[in-house]
Structure formats: C-alpha cells, structure tokens
Amino acid sequence: MKRGDLYWAELRPRSGSEQQGRRPVVILSHDGFNEAPQWRSIIVVPCSTSKLQKGRGPTVVLLTKGTAGLAADCVAVCHQITTLDRSKLTQRLGSLPLEEMRALEAGIRAAIDLDP
C-alpha cells in the first residue's frame, strides 16, 4: 500500500453528504505510515461518478477510465479527505500516474487553502 494507490473501499457507516458505499479511494498518507503494521489509519480521498461532483470546481479532480485500473470516469473528491481503518480497503486497482497525483495534490491544496 503506497501513496497514490487506488483501492476499492467500503465506506460504511457514513452520514449526511459524506461519500459512502463501495467506491475507489486514493491513498494520501505517507508511505512510512502505510507500511507500518501497527499504524491502522490510512488517509484517503474518496472518488465519485456523480455528475453533480464533476462541476464543483478545483477541489474535484477528473480520473479517466483506465487510469490506475478504473472501469469508468470518476472524480477524486478532494474536499472530502477522510481517514479509514485499513481493513476497509478491499482490493488494489493500481497507482495514479505522476500527472494525476499532482492534480490531486492541487485539489487538496484548494480544499484546505494551502499555498502551492
């Protein structure tokens, strides 16, 4: 499990407008944490195929079909960064190419108002 990997995850239970259900997530946490067996928490960005999410501006990043094993176009919803127990990750899909990872990082900076 490495930063930039895409996994299927079970996002239940969730509430309100949080992304939920079975969906791809992008691993954000540092590889040092990801590789430590005693560290159970993984920081992720959930993905969505919702057409409503696609128009939400700089905090959503398009990931096209075929990218890192995705079966359909989706968006990484950077304004919904969350922490999961690694047991919620069910299957690795692949790794984001550098260009998409940089776009995701820009989306995160926009979501939490960090300078570039």
Question: Which residues are covered by each model-predicted region?
Answer:
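Conserved functional hotspots at enzyme active or ligand-binding sites that engage polyanionic ligands
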Residues: M1-P116
